[in-house]
From Swiss-Prot:
Main location: nucleus
Name of protein: E3 ubiquitin-protein ligase BRE1B
Zinc finger (RING-type): 949-988
Glycyl lysine isopeptide (Lys-Gly) (interchain with G-Cter in SUMO2) cross-link, chain position(s): 579-580
Similarity section: Belongs to the BRE1 family.
Keywords from the UniProt entry: Acetylation, Chromatin regulator, Coiled coil, Isopeptide bond, Metal-binding, Nucleus, Phosphoprotein, Transferase, Ubl conjugation, Ubl conjugation pathway, Zinc, Zinc-finger
Protein's UniProt keywords contain Metal-binding: yes
GO biological process, one term: positive regulation of proteasomal protein catabolic process
Coiled-coil regions listed: 55-91, 190-378, 438-526, 628-947
EC number of this enzyme: 2.3.2.27
Chain intervals for the UniProt region annotation (Disordered): 1-32, 120-148, 520-562, 579-652
Originating gene: Rnf40
Native species: Rattus norvegicus (Rat)
Length: 1002
């Protein structure tokens, strides 16, 4: 990284100004390196320190020189950038104005050609020609125009002498200054301008022909000689003015060229002044250099004098050697004096050159200031006295007067138009006010009818909403009713099946009873037990059939009777359970809104009926065939039991039917409550759900209690009947189940207590809900009353609507009458519109006249604008020529500067030649002395030592490092470069591949 940084530093440091490098290369052949006197040195360290001090001085001088060169180069770069920016801006402006010039010249020529065509085709309509010229002129593109090709000479009309002179002046002024890339454009511009001049000359000739026709016509007619003389005078004056205008244009062109030349001279003098300033700075720098050199020489001279006076007489022992040294010191002293005189002469000559340049600079500055003052203080009287200014002033006054007349006519026409419009608008406003009054009446009546209609619609909407609510309630109750009907139909079908089974079992029972009677008869004959069985009761047997089947003594009849009894008991139990399930389902539907006490009886009865059924089922199979001795007593008991069971079943059916009726009534009430609770808030619904859950929990608790009782009774019975291991195992299981159920009972009791506490709260809430239901029922009654009132009001509204329809029909008839009046007024309006059209036609004529006059005004304005554009175009041409001259001036200044530089270098070379001649003469004088050969030999050795490479001390110096300008042999430099030791052996300055070159010393 250090090597790279050294390379960059060396590269930056070596970039000096090219001019200085050239001067340095020129002077290397002539300048002599002065020896440096280090004085008395006692050691190598002291010598190194003195050498380093001298090197530091030299480096400081080089740094100052480099900074000065950098400042000069920066100033020069800034000047060049400013000049380039100004040149670009002027080029852009010239290009833009040149394009505008081409477009305007093409438009002028096209306009003139169109006027010529119109005048040649229709000379009998001169009044319309001016109006048409404005519409016929097309906008042509300068790049695609046919004007790029100039007309041939045979089709051009002959020009007058002033016009020819003007065209020739234009051609002579532009052809010499045009470059190759702009020749086509310049040719087009010259051709266009020449054609414009031709057109103006042709117009002048047409005017002269018209004047001659007028004169000839006037010669045939006697009266009007004064007018003819006046026209002749005017024609002569017009011709004279046209000649004067062309002459003035030529003069303006010539003056503009002279002005541009003067301006170019001013710019050239300014550049000269700048160059002189730079040369003065260079000369001052040379003077400073010479002064420094003079000071050095003075120091050397003083040292030589001191050595001459003191040191050389004491330095040696032999007189010959001392004498030789004295002669050498005297010779050096004379040489130094001669050099001092030469330098003084050179300084005097340079001073004379500087004074001369200073005088030239002051003269150029004075002329520049004088020209600037003259340019700034251009008087206005000169501008006002020009013919163009006076002509434009006269045209402006004429156009201004015409515009004032046109404005007055336009104001009069606008006043008439406004008066007619105001009268028409007043009539229309009167009719509109009448129409608005009638419309307001109609609107008020229609608004009243709409209000009544809106009231009727509101009543209708309220009735419709109530109907939809009732319909929705019926739709909600419909699915429940359908489910109940479906359940009832399924239960009826089941009852029919059970009835069929009962009939079949009765038939089988009769057959069994007949067999039993036969068996009894056989048994009475065999065992003499006739009195006990001689009084059978058919009704009793029919009623006590299940009991008999259970306690029948016959071995063959017992299984059938047991099966029939089990089926009958199952049928009755199924019927009762189905009815109970029907009641439970009906109560569950209404349970969400009904109080908790209504659903408990059916669930309470169900656990009461279940243990009886289970006991019957257990007792049925558990009763085995009794012994033959106790058959009659058991038969009586079974009959009594069967009668009691049938009586209980009939009572149970009656109770279930009554409960079914009550449940249906409660279901209807619950439907109403359900509709009411659907509109209740969510909190009350949650309370009702809690109450329903509480009822279910209570029912489960009761059911569990009944099951526990049944299980306890079953355990007692089984403990009496069964004493084997199976019974004990069942008892243990039952006890475990009892413990589990007791634990569950304790939990349910706790839940029951919590639910009871909640029931108190929910009961209070239920009472509040009942009060709210009462209020809602009251509101429903009030709504019904309001609905009845609305119905009555609706009837009244229908009657009012009929009356309003009749009034509307009457109003429609009135509207028809008003429409007829409006039609009549429309007829009058049409007549007024016809009058307005007639007025508008007259107004259109006035406007046409106004447009014609405005077109004439615009034509005059266009002529004025064209004249102004022509002046601007001429100015642009002038600026273009000036820019061309400005472009040429830097080239001239550069060539002049190059010549001056060459002359300056020539002078310097002559001075160097004279100095070398004087040195040669001095050397020739030195050869006269006796020991000159020895001196020359020593000098030759010294020079050879200087010419040998200090690195290898064998080869000659033939390569120079451009970074520090130390000289070595090419092989050493290349070897160090290839070995990547890219630093100078003397000053340790880094160098690159392009920083060492061969040197040929001759």
């Amino acid at each position: 990284m250090s090597g790279l940084s050294n390379k960059r530093a060396a590269g930056d440091g070596g970039s000096g100004p090219p001019e200085k490098k050239l001067n340095r290369e020129e002077k290397t052949t002539t300048t002599l390196i002065e020896p440096i006197r280090l004085g008395g040195i006692s050691s190598t360290e002291e010598m190194d320190s003195k050498v380093l001090q001298f090197k530091n001085k030299k480096l400081a001088e080089r740094l100052e020189q480099r900074q000065a060169c950098e400042d000069e180069l920066r100033e020069r770069i800034e000047k060049l950038e400013k000049r380039q920016a100004t040149d670009d801006a002027t080029l852009l402006i010239v290009n833009r104005y040149w394009a505008q010039l081409d477009e305007t010249v093409e438009a002028l020529l096209q306009c003139y050609e169109n006027q010529r065509e119109l005048s040649s085709s229709g000379t009998e309509v001169p009044g319309c020609q001016e109006g048409l010229t404005r519409d016929v002129i097309p906008r042509t593109d300068p790049g695609t125009s046919d004007l790029r090709e100039p007309l041939p000479m045979q089709f051009r009309a002959p020009l007058s002498e002033p016009a020819l002179a003007f065209v020739v002046a234009l051609g002579a002024s532009s052809c010499e200054e045009v470059e190759l890339q702009l020749q086509g454009r310049m040719e087009f511009s010259k051709a266009a301008v020449s054609r414009v001049v031709e057109a103006s000359d042709r117009l002048q000739r047409q005017v002269e022909e018209l004047c001659q026709r007028v004169y000839s016509r006037g010669d045939s007619e006697a009266p009007g000689e004064v007018a003819r003389a006046r026209t002749r005078e005017l024609g002569r004056e017009n011709r004279r003015l046209q000649d004067l205008a062309t002459q003035l244009q030529e003069k303006h062109h010539r003056i503009s060229l002279e002005y541009s030349e003067l301006q170019d001279k001013v710019t050239s003098t300014e550049t000269k002044v700048l160059e002189m300033e730079t040369t003065v700075e260079d000369l001052q720098w040379d003077i400073e250099k010479l002064r420094k050199r003079e000071q050095k020489l003075n120091k050397h001279l003083a040292e030589a004098l001191e050595q001459l006076n003191s040191g050389y007489y004491v330095s040696g022992s032999s007189t010959g050697f001392q004498g030789g040294q004295i002669t050498l010191s005297m010779q050096k002293f004379e040489m130094l004096n001669a050099e001092l005189e030469e330098n003084q002469e050179l300084a005097n000559s340079r001073m004379a050159e500087l004074e001369k340049l200073q005088a030239e600079l002051q003269g150029a500055v004075r002329t520049n200031e004088r020209l600037k003052v003259a340019l700034r203080s251009l008087p206005e009287e000169v501008v006002r006295e020009t013919g163009e200014y006076r002509m434009l002033q006269a045209q402006f006054s004429l156009l201004y007067n015409e515009s004032l007349q046109v404005k007055t006519q336009l104001d009069e026409a606008r006043g008439l138009l406004l008066a007619s419009k105001n009268s028409h608008l007043r009539h229309i406003e009167h009719m509109e006010s009448d129409e608005l009054g009638l419309q307001k009446k109609l609107r008020t009546e229609v608004i009243q009818l709409e209000d009544t209609l809106a009231q009727v619609r509101k009543e209708y909407e309220m009735l419709r909403i109530e109907f939809e609510q009732n319909l929705a309630a019926n739709e909600q109750a419909g699915p429940i009713n359908r489910e109940m009907r479906h359940l009832i139909s399924s239960l009826q079908n089941h009852n029919h099946q059970l009835k069929g089974d009962a009939q079949r079992y009765k038939r089988k029972l009769r057959e069994v009873q007949a067999e039993i009677g036969k068996l009894r008869a056989q048994a009475s004959g065999s065992s003499h037990c006739g009195p006990n069985l001689s009084h059978p009761d058919d009704s009793g047997l029919n009623a006590l059939a299940p009991g008999k089947e259970d306690s029948g003594p016959g071995p063959g009849g017992t299984p059938d009777s047991k099966k029939e009894l089990a089926l009958v008991a199952g049928a009755t139990s199924v019927a009762s359970s189905v009815k109970k399930e029907e009641l439970v389902s009906s109560e569950d539907d209404a349970q969400a809104l009904a109080p908790g006490t209504q659903g408990l009886p059916s669930r309470g009865r169900e656990p009461e009926a279940r243990p009886k059924r289970e006991l019957r089922e257990r007792e049925g199979p558990s009763l085995g065939p009794p012994p033959a001795a106790s058959t009659l007593s058991r038969a009586d008991r079974e009959k009594a039991k069967a009668e009691e069971a049938r009586r209980k079943e009939s009572e149970l059916l009656k109770g279930l039917r009554a409960e079914l009726k009550k449940a249906q009534e409660s279901q209807k009430e619950m439907k109403l409550l359900l509709d009411m609770y659907k509109s209740a808030p969510k909190e009350q619904r949650d309370k009702v759900q809690l109450m329903a859950a509480e009822r279910k929990a209570k029912a489960e608790v009761d059911e569990l209690r009944s099951r526990i009782r049944d299980l306890e009774e079953r355990d007692r019975r089984e403990s009496k009947k069964i004493a084997d291991e199976d019974a004990l195992r069942r008892i243990r299981q039952a006890e475990e189940q009892i413990e589990h159920l007791q634990r569950k009972l304790g939990a349910t009791k706790q839940e029951e207590e919590a639910l009871l506490s909640e029931m108190d709260v929910t009961g209070q809430a239920f009472e509040d809900m009942q009060e709210q239901n009462g209020r809602l029922l009251q509101q429903l009654r009030e709504k019904d009353d309001a609905n009845f009132k609305l119905m009555s009001e609706r009837i009244k509204a229908n009657q009012i609507h009929k009356l309003l329809r009749e009034e509307k029909d009457e109003l429609g008839e009135q509207v028809l009458g008003l429409k007829s009046q409006v039609d009549a007024q429309l007829l009058t309006v049409q007549k007024l519109e016809e009058k307005e059209r007639a007025l508008q036609g007259s107004l259109g004529g006035v406007e046409k006249e106004l447009t014609l006059r405005s077109q004439a005004l615009e034509l005059n304005k266009r002529k004025a604008v064209e004249a102004a554009q022509l002046a601007e175009d001429l100015k642009v041409q002038l600026e273009h020529v000036q820019t061309r001259l400005r472009e040429i001036q830097p080239c001239l200044a550069e060539s002049r500067a190059a010549r001056e530089k060459e002359s300056f270098n020539l002078k310097r070379a002559q001075e160097d030649i004279s100095r070398l001649r004087r040195k040669l003469e001095k050397q020739r004088k030195v050869e006269v002395y006796a020991d000159a050969d020895e001196i020359l030999q020593e000098e030759i050795k010294e020079y050879k030592a200087r010419l040998t490479c200090p690195c290898c001390n064998t080869r000659k110096k033939d390569a120079v490092l451009t970074k520090c300008f130390h000289v070595f042999c090419f092989e050493c430099v290349r070897g160090r470069y290839e070995a990547r030791q890219r630093k100078c052996p003397k000053c340790n300055a880094a160098f690159g591949a392009h920083d060492f070159h061969r040197v040929y010393i001759s």
